[in-house]
Amino acid sequence: MIILKNENEIDLMRKAGKILGETLNLLKEKVRPGITTTELDRIAEEFITKHGATPSFKGLYGFPASLCISVNNQVIHGFPGSYELKDGDIVSIDCGVCLNGFHSDAARTFGVGNISEEAEKLIRITEESFFKGIEKAYVDNRLTDISNEIQQYVEANGFSVVRDFVGHGIGRKVHEDPEVPNFGRPGRGPKLMAGMVLAIEPMVNMGSYRVKTLDDGWTVVTADGKLSAHYENTVAILPNGPEILTLIK
């Protein structure tokens, strides 16, 4: 069941989203060769709790950390450890923040030091595909209008969208209905309505869209070992169009 949010609830999510956007901006400054993924997790959790909120992911389904940190061919759900980021890596950081009972969810992919032109393009196209998608995030459009726009843009640029994992509704729970795929034919799925809040999150692979899960039960990697990027924001569907709740310029 899709749960519509009223103006007050969206305002609460806006506040959670602001903390999350600021967290990701801080992490962007901290990403550098030599820093461990555990240190990034510590920085994020400290910043979130200092602002009176809690990390949404820690303990969710038994997840052990505040951040999902996925490096290079890792797609999503990597968890922090002793790995030191290296020059040329790309790192996807996915984070959630809960404030006053409402969640926000967002992800960014950053280059570490000097990265290849192809890796830069992958990160850029992944981010741009999100913004292409939300051009369709208007009342009375269909959910897969967003999905199709993302897929068309990604594939036109020579990359592929992950199909085994999708975006989702969000609110009092991190994961709510509906599922928000990044692929599919337009004109399908539920009609978009004012009060929907969606976590829209293109996951884009340099090679095949196929993925697999490692033996740790969490970390999802590309099946062909090629790079993957992830970009996500929490988006409210309002009567006059979409509002991104987790993007702080």
UniProtKB/Swiss-Prot annotation:
Entry-linked SUPFAM superfamilies: Creatinase/aminopeptidase (SSF55920)
Signal among keywords: no
GO biological process, one term: proteolysis
Cofactor dependence: Co(2+); Zn(2+); Mn(2+); Fe(2+)
Database matches in Pfam families: Peptidase_M24 (PF00557)
A cellular component annotation (GO) from this entry: cytosol
Binding site for substrate: 77, 175
PROSITE patterns: MAP_1
Annotated keywords: Aminopeptidase, Hydrolase, Metal-binding, Protease
tRNA processing is among the record's keywords: no
Binding locations of a divalent metal cation 1: 94, 105, 232
Quaternary assembly: Monomer.
Similarity comment: family membership: Belongs to the peptidase M24A family. Methionine aminopeptidase type 1 subfamily.
Function: Removes the N-terminal methionine from nascent proteins. The N-terminal methionine is often cleaved when the second residue in the primary sequence is small and uncharged (Met-Ala-, Cys, Gly, Pro, Ser, Thr, or Val). Requires deformylation of the N(alpha)-formylated initiator methionine before it can be hydrolyzed.
Protein name: Methionine aminopeptidase
